[in-house]
Design a protein with these regions (language model features):
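Active-site-lining helix/loop region of Rossmann-like oxidoreductase modules
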Residues: 1-110
């Protein structure tokens, strides 16, 4: 994101960034990939599912929950986006409003 926005920031400035990321389960690891596959197969077969990796069903669902929630309501992943943007832009005042969502895709963030 910052690679695309930095030239704009340098040319005319940016005061606020609203951004959403849609991240595949592979970002959580092998167990998450297996959980998505298992839940998908079971739901399509009319069976009950088990949630072990994620706190809620991931198959046919989206979870606005990547990493742990912080006291300010953002997740750690969202806070990393804020911190990194401010650091790279050299602007501690820039407002960044990220939403990071886990989606039921095996590989490839959107």
């Amino acid at each position: 994101m910052v690679v695309a926005l930095k030239p704009i920031y340098d040319a005319v400035g940016i005061k606020r960034i609203n951004v959403a990321t849609y991240q595949a389960v592979s970002g959580t690891g092998k167990e998450a990939i297996e959980e998505l596959a298992s839940q998908t197969a079971k739901l399509l077969s009319g069976q009950d599912i088990v949630c072990e990796v994620y706190p809620k069903q991931i198959a046919f669902n989206v979870l606005p929950h990547i990493d742990t929630f912080q006291d300010n309501g953002y997740t750690r992943e969202e806070m990393k986006m804020i911190w990194e943007t401010r650091k790279i832009f050299g602007d501690p005042a820039i407002q960044v409003n990220p939403t990071c969502v886990r989606v039921p895709v095996f590989f490839g963030h959107s």
